[in-house]
UniProtKB/Swiss-Prot annotation:
Cited function: Catalyzes the interconversion of methylthioribose-1-phosphate (MTR-1-P) into methylthioribulose-1-phosphate (MTRu-1-P).
GO terms (BP aspect): L-methionine salvage from methylthioadenosine
Binding-site positions, substrate: 46-48, 80, 174, 224-225
Residues carrying the site annotation Transition state stabilizer: 135
UniProt entry keywords in alphabetical sequence: Amino-acid biosynthesis, Isomerase, Methionine biosynthesis
EC category name: isomerase
UniProt xrefs under Pfam families: IF-2B
Gene Ontology terms for molecular function: S-methyl-5-thioribose-1-phosphate isomerase activity
Species per Swiss-Prot/TrEMBL record: Methanothermobacter thermautotrophicus (strain ATCC 29096 / DSM 1053 / JCM 10044 / NBRC 100330 / Delta H)
Name of the protein in its database record: Putative methylthioribose-1-phosphate isomerase
Reaction equation(s) it catalyzes: 5-(methylsulfanyl)-alpha-D-ribose 1-phosphate = 5-(methylsulfanyl)-D-ribulose 1-phosphate
Keyword set includes Amino-acid biosynthesis: yes
Keyword Isomerase: yes
Length: 311
């Protein structure tokens, strides 16, 4: 994509409003740190690296406005509990003498990091491969370029012919709405499947690799968008290599993956789709936003430093 998910313009943070895609490309302007919290909570911006950079600018905006930065930092941290990049970014900016300069540095680093991830991962993809990805770990999940989709972009730019399979990623549909859109912008062949079709495609030999992103990597496994575990289990059963692509900032070296908080989102996301109710009245729904892929299901973790073993 030739556009940035996040841009700092004239004292405002301008975000692609991902709730509007793919129907329209609109922007959401954050004029203070409270707008940043709204954007993160309501998935105007999503994806661990993008949330981290957005949070960094949120702290900077609080400092520039003369707000209580400590209070702002804690409120920003509380906006989404599972993505470790959020906490890492806020803590890093808080230690800086100039929060705005540090946020801009992190913005630039994110672009460089994603391209390094792409370079390291591109060699895993062979000419003619069909690659399955879950949710959206592309340019829209970062400042630009992406992690999992960055690997696919890099392989495509290397001249490899490939096909991308995106699952829809219920309940919010990030695969259908965002990943398919990104691949179409690049002219990379892409097909959409329902979430429950992934196992069948692997069983019948239609998938050569799986590459997903991550919201947190810790001892014992990886936390990523709900549904990642089912994809990983099918990949293990049918001997399909399963890779995670993420920056080093997504690593949490202080906790077990099973000790982290898994965000529970509004049940309405499950009960409604496209504004239409899809279940009977008075139906109760459970809506965890993430699940955990154990380390033994992961073939490798693609980072800016190379391909690493799972923790």
């Amino acid at each position: 994509m030739n556009m940035k998910t996040i841009e700092w313009k004239d004292g405002e943070l301008v975000l692609i409003d991902q709730r509007k895609l793919p129907d329209s490309l609109e922007y959401f302007r954050c004029r203070d740190y409270r707008d940043v919290i709204y954007a993160i909570k309501n998935m105007v911006v999503r994806g661990a690296p993008a949330i981290g950079v957005t949070a960094a600018f949120g702290v900077a905006m609080a400092e520039l406005a003369g707000e209580d930065v400590e209070v702002a930092a804690e409120e920003i941290k509380a906006s989404r509990p599972t993505a470790v990049n959020l906490f890492w970014a806020v803590d890093r900016v808080m230690k800086s003498e100039s929060p705005l300069d540090e946020a801009i540095t992190m913005y630039m680093e994110d672009m460089e990091t994603n391209r390094a991830i792409g370079r390291h991962g591109a060699g895993l993809i062979e000419d003619g491969d069909t690659v399955l990805t879950h949710c959206n770990a592309g340019a829209l999940a970062c400042v630009d370029y992406g992690t999992a989709l960055g690997v696919i972009r890099a392989a495509w730019d290397d001249g490899k012919r490939l096909t991308v399979i995106c699952d829809e990623t219920r309940p919010v549909g990030q695969g259908a709405r965002l990943s398919v859109w990104e691949m179409q912008q690049e002219g990379i062949p892409v097909k959409l499947i329902t979430d429950v079709a992934a196992g069948y495609l692997m069983q019948t030999g239609m998938i050569d690799k799986v590459i997903i992103g991550a919201d947190r990597i810790a001892e014992g496994g990886v936390a990523n968008k709900i549904g990642s575990l089912m994809v990983a289990l099918a990949a293990k059963r049918f001997n399909v290599p399963f890779y995670v692509a993420a920056p080093m900032s997504t690593f949490d070296t202080e906790n077990s993956i099973y000790d982290i908080e898994i965000e529970e989102r509004d049940p309405a996301e499950v009960l409604y789709y496209g504004g239409c109710r899809i279940a009977p009245q008075d139906t109760e729904a459970i809506n965890p936003a993430f699940d955990i892929v154990p380390s033994d299901l992961i073939s490798g973790i693609i980072t800016e430093k190379g391909i690493l073993d799972p923790l």
